[in-house]
Amino acid sequence: MDPAGAADPSVPPNPLTHLSLQDRSEMQLQSEADRRSLPGTWTRSSPEHTTILRGGVRRCLQQQCEQTVRILHAKVAQKSYGNEKRFFCPPPCVYLSGPGWRVKPGQDQAHQAGETGPTVCGYMGLDSASGSATETQKLNFEQQPDSREFGCAKTLYISDADKRKHFRLVLRLVLRGGRELGTFHSRLIKVISKPSQKKQSLKNTDLCISSGSKVSLFNRLRSQTVSTRYLSVEDGAFVASARQWAAFTLHLADGHSAQGDFPPREGYVRYGSLVQLVCTVTGITLPPMIIRKVAKQCALLDVDEPISQLHKCAFQFPGSPPGGGGTYLCLATEKVVQFQASPCPKEANRALLNDSSCWTIIGTESVEFSFSTSLACTLEPVTPVPLISTLELSGGGDVATLELHGENFHAGLKVWFGDVEAETMYRSPRSLVCVVPDVAAFCSDWRWLRAPITIPMSLVRADGLFYPSAFSFTYTPEYSVRPGHPGVPEPATDADALLESIHQEFTRTNFHLFIQT
């Protein structure tokens, strides 16, 4: 069932939860659009405000007009010393996606004048201990074949004068015309002096790489920065790109499983393990390969220590004949090919590689912020963008509540189920609680439902700014038969009361949560 068609937006909604309506004095308090509730207070917008918002939320759900900002960066950064500048590798990059970026506002003079190109410009830098952004680099966004806008900060670095062990990247987006869209922060990045040369152990897992984590691979011929190429995917094929990198999920593979099947295997990846790389965007995979440690341009065949950040490694295709050097993943200009290694004449447990077969591995992080400005009538920035991480259902019967765990929550947010606003309580920047609307708000014939109803969940700011989420809520019905159906006896006079009790019991025990992918 389409939640967008649940009710007429011109009619103020009836109470949608099992809680009673507030009295008139409470409603007057909450009719203030800019009201900031105290933690622990249940709030709901006024009926007039809800009616206005409801039509806009419905349009956002139907037209899919969200805008997404995705920041992709490495987990660690190597510190620069003296006058040197060790630019972050791979360089932090930003993707702007979603149809909302292509909506042309009527008030936008630039669009009216017929100008083309990105509607925003970006500036990226490091946060500082004082909380303000340091020197920034301007991002030049380019449109990709998949319609995403891509920008890259190639000259960011952290000097030895900065004594922090961790920092964040700060992205500032400004709309054409000068209005600030918002300031977005990356995940924490760990600062290291140089790649660890010691034998790794699981006693200190800070820099180890676990199965299922995201990594990037890059190659530098003769250790020259200008020759850096990144493993990436373009047009459905693996390539070695000089300008754009991709994140891959590193799975511990099972040699006895079907290709593409990754049974859950916890733990840290060790050299000598069979692994598989899966592109996080396209899902395209490389064949299972054995990851080898590299030292002095040789693959070490007898090393089984844990892999560490910024280590040099090689990927050997299994099935090499005994006594041979093995076949390895290699780049040739922009192509990804196979390289036939030679056995080391002096040491049997080594294979001789070329420069193009030696890769540097590093863990990556990404963070996404989604919003839609088409509903809001505000000049305020869209940030901080709330992020939902988990949901926790409690109660049932007359009242079922749902707690949202995440970050960047504030008292001006309301939880929406489809186009229905839920009574919301702000607890902390990491917790919101809402009352689950009755299923009758989405289907008048809920007593006769035979299929689950899945409702998308979102957050809406007091000024109408819409924040979609990846979460949905599913009402799962009991099997019921509509009265009057051929061959079915008429229900008893107390059938409605019985059905209501069944509904309440079902409400208590049979809610299910799903994450949309």
Curated annotation (Swiss-Prot):
Q: Spell out the Pfam families in the cross-references.
A: BTD (PF09270), LAG1-DNAbind (PF09271), TIG_SUH (PF20144)
Recite the UniProt keywords alphabetically.
DNA-binding, Nucleus, Transcription, Transcription regulation
Q: Which residues form the IPT/TIG domain?
A: 387-512
GO BP annotations of the record are:
signal transduction
Region DNA-binding: which residues? Answer: 78-88, 193-198, 220-225
Skewed-composition ranges (Basic and acidic residues): 26-37
Instruction: Give the UniProt subcellular location, in the record's own words.
Output: Nucleus
User: Region Disordered: what ranges?
Assistant: 26-48
Q: What InterPro entries does the database record attribute to this sequence? A: Beta-trefoil_DNA-bd_dom, BTD_sf, CLS_fam, Ig-like_fold, Ig_E-set, p53-like_TF_DNA-bd_sf, RBP-J/Cbf11/Cbf12_DNA-bd, RBP-J/Cbf11_DNA-bd_sf
Task: Tell me its family.
Answer: Belongs to the Su(H) family.
On assembly, the entry states: Interacts weakly with EBNA2. Does not interact with any Notch proteins.
This protein is called Recombining binding protein suppressor of hairless-like protein
